[in-house]
Amino acid sequence: MLEQPGNQTGRNSFMIDLNVLKQEIIEYSRTIGIDKIGFASAEPFTALKQRLIRQQQLHYQSGFEEPDVEKRTNPALLLDGAASIIAIALAYPAKMKKRVESKKGLRRGFFCRASWGLDYHEILKDRLTKLEEFIRAKVPGVKVKSMRDTGELYDRAVAERAGIGWSGKNCAIITPEFGSYVYLGEMITNLPFEPDEPIENMCGDCTKCLEACPTGALVQGGQLNAKRCISYWTQTKGFVPDEIREKIGNRLYGCDSCQTACPKNKGIDFHLHPEMEPEPELAKPLLKPLLHVSNREFKKKFGNMAGAWRGKRPIQRNAIIALAHFKDDTALDDLIGLLKDPRPEIRGTAAWALGKIGGKEAEEALKAASGKETDWEVLREIENGLAMLRK
């Protein structure tokens, strides 16, 4: 039984049985589409703090995450009186029920599984909001703060502490039920719930994820150099390094290699939430139409996907890389037209792609562009393209 007295600010007091409330929360979570829930203490993540500091020293972080290590590892800085954290997980599909139409010569790219269906940030927000409302109704005056991977806390560490799963060598939370195909969210609260036990790490001696990583971004089990991760580069704006381009293939957003290689994901494919179901033509879109899509068309078609958060520019650049990967000579006219695009990274990547695909037409276009181009990075790409054609 917990009694929280009122204080000088006039906050209402309340008395509740936390064990009963915890069970009520667990049962309610099942009715609103939360697939797994766990409870953890809100003590600082001391070991994690040292690892994150080391990551910063090595320049291994992506830059998309919260830069303040203290905020990432100390829940008390995010909520006054933080006593525990409720962690949730939602399972997402690993396979598409419907297949895309396959026609010879029509090349496609693909979005990673975590980007299928409705943006998972919105789905998690919906579930956490409902959970908040339930707890507030049970405990008037309670303090809570919810977040997803865009928040301050390191969600994988929270999920691990709360017994959702273990932290795999592929830097993902692996659950016994759903593998690593789960979205994570958490809620800090001033209610001191009894914490759940963490799950034993079951990776063992397996290193399949490390071996499957196309760029060697998994430095060692549980340590990622985001600056080498394909998923990171598909989300950046600007030029992609040559060595990464060669590994991207036809990925438009994200990379699943370290997940599909994991034995714990073998046979895993849950379709529990209709809003997560992928639309085949969005998950695996045709490449050439992407080159000419307008901002309005892109937002209308892809705007509800998590993979659209950086806008159309990275997706278009990645589509160019994918066409080069396929050496699709039917795209030559499209790529030659992009040599006049106002965006340097699009012009430059198109020049590189023309060099990869090859042919007299590509060579003539690159030579003509070299006499007009003024951007030094684009000029470098044009020279690289011409050098490939001379081989």
For each feature predicted by the language model, list its residue ranges.
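Cationic, low-complexity basic patches in intrinsically disordered or flexible, solvent-exposed regions
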Residues: 4-5
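Auxiliary alpha/beta "docking" domains used to position bulky ligands
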Residues: 14-202
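Short, charged low-complexity linear segments at domain edges
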Residues: 173-198, 225-244, 295-299
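Iron-sulfur cluster-binding cysteine motifs and their immediate structural context
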Residues: 208-231, 248-275
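Glycine-rich phosphate/pyrophosphate-binding loop
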Residues: 280-317
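Amphipathic alpha-helical scaffolding segments comprising HEAT/armadillo-like alpha-solenoid repeats
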Residues: 297-302, 328-340, 359-371, 391
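Short inter-helical turns and helix N-cap capping residues of alpha-solenoid HEAT/ARM repeat scaffolds
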Residues: 312, 342-343, 374-375
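Structural detector for internal amphipathic alpha-helices that build alpha-solenoid repeat scaffolds
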Residues: 316-328, 347-359, 379-391
